[in-house]
Amino acid sequence: MNKLLYTLAFCLFSQSVVWAGDIWVSPTGNDNDEGTLEAPFQTIEKAIKQAREWRRLQTPEVNGGIYIHLADGIYYQEKTLFIRPEDSGTSQSPTVIEADGEAVISGGVQISGWKPFTDFEPRLPNQTKGKIWVAEAPSVGNRHLEFRQMWVNDRKAQRASQFADGVMERMINFNVQDETITIPTPLIQGLEDAPLLEMIVHQRWAIAILRVRSMETKGDSTVVRFHEPESHLEFSHPWPQPVIGGEKGNSSFCLVNDLSLLDEPGEWYQEYPSGRIYYYPRENEDMNQATVIVPALENLVFVDGSLERPVQYVKFKNVRFEHTAWNRPSSEGHVTLQGGFRLLDAYKLATPGLPEKATLENQAWIARPEAAIRVKGSNNIDFDGCTFQHMGATGVDYEWAVTNSTINSSCFTDIGGTAILMGAFPDGGFETHVPFKPINEKELCSDILVQDNLITNVTNEDWGCVGIGAGYVKNVTISHNEVSHVNYSGICVGWGWTLLESGMKNNCIEANYVHHFAQRLYDAGGLYTLSYQPGSIMRNNRIEQLTDAPYATNERAFYIYFDEATDGYTVENNWCPEERFDSNQPGPNNVWKINGPRVDEYIKLNAGIRKP
């Protein structure tokens, strides 16, 4: 009788318990093992494949969710981690990839074998001779790895530059017809023979990166010409171009990436085609002991679904993502329209007007920036308590048809582009001023929550990027984030420069703390919007420390900036130290209430990241 009761109780208990599937991964594991705590896999890819097989076969491990546990250590990725519809979980059985300690998913490789450089090299500045160290670039596949980013002891090093970081010089002339920029003749000799020289051009709210083709010195001035395709783009697109004769002077520039410019500690240069790396160590850096990492991947994770078969219910928790590249400017240059979106073509219209916008005087076609984490055609793809750092371009990008997803309590720092990007910015053959209104509304990103994230020191490669950027989106909430130390705008919502209906609506920018913005560029806003977004709200934010960008050509930077055709917003209780706002050709349906220094102190103090 007792045995019968025990058996019955066990069966009832078994039916009431929801079992979960656990998979363990360690950098010291083995993919031929079982993926258990005692015998973990080595790669995350193997763990995800195991989870995929459990779901395909509907084994008992699926019932309570699948948890992939990452042990301490660095998981160097040789290829992008690809997550597909077959990896989907459900609301009752999600797939969770979580770090049990300090787990890092890295797209980098280590550089070793550093030696003092003792050879004679006439291009090196005299003051650095005897101070430079060299190493050979590793081979990835069948060629030397080429890169534009490098980190020494977890600190970003700078490419060899004409001036110290952040310093520029005013140009003399910008000639559209001849496709030339005239600059003061550099003090450094031999730059006309520099094979990989680039010019960074400061142009209002964006930058251009132009590969130098030739330099012709005429006394105190030097005329610079550039390679294609960027030369045509730079001189044909009207917005934004450099300014000559601005209120505060001409636009500025800086030359980078030649051995003759390697004159400051913390700078480096990579030779081509040998791949040899030259580095000028900072004080207290021992190159015999230093950890030097360069990126080999541009994209760490790609979550790729469709409207018909979305990826669903995948979550990353407490994971660090590091070391991604941004290489395209080395082969194509980089000329942007706004927000880091590079131009494919752009020009001024001799006769203004499109059917969608009668006053339009230019057209532009754009491409999306590269991203470390890409998400498409998905729902319930969440990042919780993660860290994103040491990245060349965008951090996380919810690109297309992403819904019901959250980025929560995460940290974004040392990122070359935008920290968080979401929504459609129509690219390729879709002209960027035409309203994006897809036949299937599910193509719009919607119901995304971005909250309690720290975003700081981003936009450090492409200064025209932003802290958080959203294009054509609806029902998006951006709340209680802290965004600081960005070179252009803090939080930007909207695209298209249009008063026409597009599907953008019901967006909320609430209780964020934005400070130290517009550090290098201007025509910026701590909070910035574009186009018609009915039912949208901007409230209870704190915006301060608007930086006086040192090379701006005018004073156009604002705490709140409603740029062209912004409409449908209620703006209330946003604290800033003065009412420095701007509305550029807004629509008629914006409602402004109390904003500025009169806003209650309680609202000011409660903006930003909430305590757990």
Which residue stretches match the model-derived regions?
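Bacterial N-terminal signal peptides
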Residues: 7-16
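Boundary at the C-terminal end of the N-terminal hydrophobic targeting segment
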Residues: 18-20
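Right-handed parallel beta-helix
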Residues: 312-323, 359, 379-390, 402-417, ...
